[in-house]
């Protein structure tokens, strides 16, 4: 565990432990880091980073701050909007993003929030990269240059990515559940856009012997 990032990201009370400035700097570092990584691999296209968030009021603030940091460093930001952490991990992997960012503090109180960074494989970000993010947050690195002119990153509405994840969930739902007495689905406010679509499929299936509970 580092100074800022714990076992499940950077969490704390919004505006105190985790501020808009923190989010901006995380975006600045990630945009710069993944652009530099691409350049070393002979790829001059801007880094692509996908962002999701939960329904906390502060999530919008952190989303804007992250986008500002990413685009200022020359990376392109793709917005899934309100969604779930698994959807960000899935889309980061299947749509070849450099990384994904989920803005959420999970079960923490409503006034908390968090930033979880997921690598392009849909897994937790590598520890050595987290160490470098923390060094940048603490001012232990040289200032990252700003992208200029046409190198400034773009921001894209990527609700289509969320729909792709819904399609993946539906593909799971079409498997046989014969013999199962209970199916449990987790639900928070962030799950609602996904759950509404998937629920339509459940309602159309003959599952007279199966009880579905949402928790």
State where each predicted segment sits.
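Gly/Ser/Thr-enriched, mixed-charge loops and adjacent short helices
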Residues: 13, 113-215
């Amino acid at each position: 565990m580092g100074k800022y990032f714990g076992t499940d990201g950077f969490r704390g009370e919004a505006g105190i432990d985790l501020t808009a400035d923190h989010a901006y700097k995380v975006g600045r570092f990630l945009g710069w880091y993944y652009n530099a990584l691409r350049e070393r691999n002979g790829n001059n296209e801007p880094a692509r980073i996908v962002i999701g968030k939960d329904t906390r009021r502060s999530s919008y603030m952190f989303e804007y701050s992250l986008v500002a940091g990413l685009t200022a460093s020359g990376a392109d930001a793709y917005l899934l909007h309100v969604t779930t952490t698994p959807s960000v991990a899935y889309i980061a992997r299947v749509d070849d993003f450099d990384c994904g960012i989920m803005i959420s503090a999970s079960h923490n109180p409503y006034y908390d929030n968090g930033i979880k960074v997921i690598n392009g494989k849909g897994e937790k970000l590598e520890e050595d990269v987290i160490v470098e993010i923390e060094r940048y947050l603490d001012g232990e690195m040289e200032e990252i240059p700003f992208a200029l002119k046409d190198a400034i990153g773009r921001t894209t509405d990527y609700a289509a990515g969320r729909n792709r994840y819904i399609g993946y969930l539906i593909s799971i739902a079409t498997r046989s559940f014969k013999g199962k007495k209970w199916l449990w689905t987790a639900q928070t406010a962030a799950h609602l856009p996904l759950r509404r679509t998937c629920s339509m499929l459940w309602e159309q299936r003959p599952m007279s012997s199966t009880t579905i509970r949402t928790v």
